């Protein structure tokens, strides 16, 4: 599997795919730096006027509803329509789905047309049960709780969707294939924007891998392994953030192999 990961990263760094990000303002800087570290070329757009052109230039479209308002909703819906027309993959992070009515409704609309969806267990469960309430961006549920919902959602999506349920344990499925991943480090949950950036990395991997399940699986594994390597070098979240970017960039597969083969 490390060989597949290496090949995908080499393609990323050779092709430098453009990823259009329609995302939140909280994690935008860190997200852009993660894209650059792995070799992708991010565009962070906030204008409806250039959507058609930018999606035409992009290899994937990343939607993240972290900072939601009516203008963002209109922009994201229009981006989906254009991306479908241009046959571009849509990678979606349903931040806060299940927390408020509007977030849940927007998430349901965007889910139907997504190529990859990534969220913690509570966000994924909110798609299957409108009565579920979540705690902002945090999850009160475990990955195991969300497995059946994730498989059902993957089978219901219109675009052959892969669902990535992430947390202490990660679960990836496209409805037919599934993978459980036990990598990463608890310190990753103490850095704002880490989940948003993980979804961005999945968008980058999907831009060079046509199989959404494989793109999600390899992206989650690479991101998690980089977190483990960064944790070796620090004790707290401040330095961790910097070292994590270094590890994304370094792609030290010799060090990764120690964790991957345990």
Swiss-Prot record:
Residues spanning the membrane: none
Binding residues for substrate: 44, 193
Pathway: Cofactor biosynthesis; thiamine diphosphate biosynthesis; 4-methyl-5-(2-phosphoethyl)-thiazole from 5-(2-hydroxyethyl)-4-methylthiazole: step 1/1
Binding positions (ATP): 118, 166
GO molecular function annotations of the record: ATP binding; hydroxyethylthiazole kinase activity; magnesium ion binding
Obligatory cofactor(s): Mg(2+)
Domain of life of the source: Bacteria
Keywords: ATP-binding, Kinase, Magnesium, Metal-binding, Nucleotide-binding, Thiamine biosynthesis, Transferase
One Gene Ontology term from the biological process aspect of the record: thiamine biosynthetic process
Keyword Ligase in annotation: no
SUPFAM superfamilies: Ribokinase-like
Documented EC number(s): 2.7.1.50
InterPro entries: Hyethyz_kinase, Ribokinase-like
Enzyme class, UniProt record, top EC level: transferase
Catalysed reactions, as listed in the record: 5-(2-hydroxyethyl)-4-methylthiazole + ATP = 4-methyl-5-(2-phosphooxyethyl)-thiazole + ADP + H(+)
Annotated function: Catalyzes the phosphorylation of the hydroxyl group of 4-methyl-5-beta-hydroxyethylthiazole (THZ).
Family as reported in the entry's similarity comment: Belongs to the Thz kinase family.
Protein name: Hydroxyethylthiazole kinase
Source species taxonomy: Bacteria, Pseudomonadati, Chlamydiota, Chlamydiia, Chlamydiales
